[in-house]
Amino acid sequence: MTTPGTFEIHATDGAARTGCLHTAHGIVRTPIFMPVGTVGSVKAIAPDDLEAIGAEIILGNTYHLYLRPGDELVARRGGLHEFNAWRKPILTDSGGFQVFSLSGLRRIAEEGVEFRSHLDGSKHLFTPEKVVSIQRNLNSDIMMVLDECVPYGADRTYTEKSVGLTTRWAKRCRDAYPKGAAGNLLFGITQGGFFKDLRTRSIGALTDIDFDGFALGGLSVGEPKAEMMDLLYHSAPLLPADKPRYLMGVGTPLDIINGIAAGVDMFDCVLPTRNARNGTLYTSLGKLNIKRREFAEDDGPLDPACSCYTCRTFSRAYLRHLYTAKELLAFRLNSIHNLTYFLDLVRGARAAIAAGRFAEYKRSFEAIYPEEVVA
């Protein structure tokens, strides 16, 4: 078996690249989209559904799993793979973003971040060492360091101070889990807000720490699309070329295409499943709102170009009926389709890069989502 953490690049087309990342639970082909299973399950989707649509890796969240059911409970059951019956790779976020976004009361210090649970108000402390320990209990294939995700609009003084703290926390995470200690991989998270020089500084500082991969954090936090794209194309090429690059929490189909064009390998976002539960579905012709009356007697498939179970089996009329009747099956069928769309997107990107036609592939998505194109 190839050593976990081995990252091979198979083809390039401009900055876009295809490859594979070896983990303790199998190979992840890149570029890849990771369905989000925040509390250990991808909402409305069973593991066999994920297998059927070709998911290769899913994401879990340290903050949520620590609070409920508890990482030690999961560890006693053999780790998250045994607990949720997903046998392929799992990445766990450190929970830092949730601490800063969900916890109304929190205190940041050199030691870590103190916060109150959004469930019952109980007080907790996340240190770099603690989040590594939690993720070791979960036994995820890829663990993330504790970082501070500064909000959009934070001034330079605060952001510069935060970059220093995030760097020191990252070093403590690496010290708590030395490289090669076990089969779990540890990724660093670069920050820097919306200041290019601070982004460059953060990347340089974390590159000096020997992580198995590197993430771009703190994007898609409310900034204008043009600003996000500017920072993405500035930052991604600065990340080590021989390690996997991960754009956290992004995004729309065209965001992912732009990320791939910038040289990013890994993506996650709640958008496909959240929108599925709200009746917004992605198709080869763009977004479709299944709630619309025009679909009440439409016997055609949701997307004739899609081969997922939903599109092979059910009509738009039936899908609209399920949604308007508030049937739970609507969540599953819509989620199967949207996740298939996102996974087909990265599968298509891999093929386009290998064939040397990624620019053409990118233009095809710009034609589908013209409102998102940044000049």
Swiss-Prot record:
Q: Which GO terms describe its cellular component?
A: cytosol
Presence of the UniProt keyword Glycoprotein in the record: no
What pathway does this protein act in? tRNA modification; tRNA-queuosine biosynthesis
GO terms of biological process kind: queuosine biosynthetic process; tRNA wobble guanine modification; tRNA-guanine transglycosylation
Q: Which molecular-function annotation in GO is an example for this chain? A: tRNA-guanosine(34) queuine transglycosylase activity
Cofactors demanded by this protein: Zn(2+)
**Any Pfam family the entry gives:** TGT
Write out the catalysed reaction: 7-aminomethyl-7-carbaguanine + guanosine(34) in tRNA = 7-aminomethyl-7-carbaguanosine(34) in tRNA + guanine
- Active-site residues, record numbering mapped to chain: 93 (proton acceptor), 268 (nucleophile)
The enzyme's E.C. designation: 2.4.2.29
> Per its UniProt entry, which superkingdom is the organism in?
Bacteria
Binding-site list for substrate: 93-97, 147, 191, 218
Ordered alphabetically, the record's keywords are:
Glycosyltransferase, Metal-binding, Queuosine biosynthesis, Transferase, tRNA processing, Zinc
| CC cofactor note | Binds 1 zinc ion per subunit.
Region annotated RNA binding sits at 249-255, 273-277
Would the keyword Cell membrane turn up in this protein's UniProt record?
A: no
Annotated Zn(2+) binding lies at 306, 308, 311, 337
Q: Which PANTHER family has this protein been placed in?
A: QUEUINE TRNA-RIBOSYLTRANSFERASE
Q: Which HAMAP family match?
A: Q_tRNA_Tgt
Q: What does this protein do?
A: Catalyzes the base-exchange of a guanine (G) residue with the queuine precursor 7-aminomethyl-7-deazaguanine (PreQ1) at position 34 (anticodon wobble position) in tRNAs with GU(N) anticodons (tRNA-Asp, -Asn, -His and -Tyr). Catalysis occurs through a double-displacement mechanism. The nucleophile active site attacks the C1' of nucleotide 34 to detach the guanine base from the RNA, forming a covalent enzyme-RNA intermediate. The proton acceptor active site deprotonates the incoming PreQ1, allowing a nucleophilic attack on the C1' of the ribose to form the product.
User: Can you state the subunit structure given in the record?
Assistant: Homodimer. Within each dimer, one monomer is responsible for RNA recognition and catalysis, while the other monomer binds to the replacement base PreQ1.
The record's listing under NCBIfam families reads: Q_tRNA_tgt, tgt_general
Q: Which family does it belong to?
A: Belongs to the queuine tRNA-ribosyltransferase family.
Name-wise, this protein is: Queuine tRNA-ribosyltransferase
The species is Nitratidesulfovibrio vulgaris (strain ATCC 29579 / DSM 644 / CCUG 34227 / NCIMB 8303 / VKM B-1760 / Hildenborough) (Desulfovibrio vulgaris)
Q: What is the lineage of its organism?
A: Bacteria, Pseudomonadati, Thermodesulfobacteriota, Desulfovibrionia, Desulfovibrionales
Report the gene name: tgt
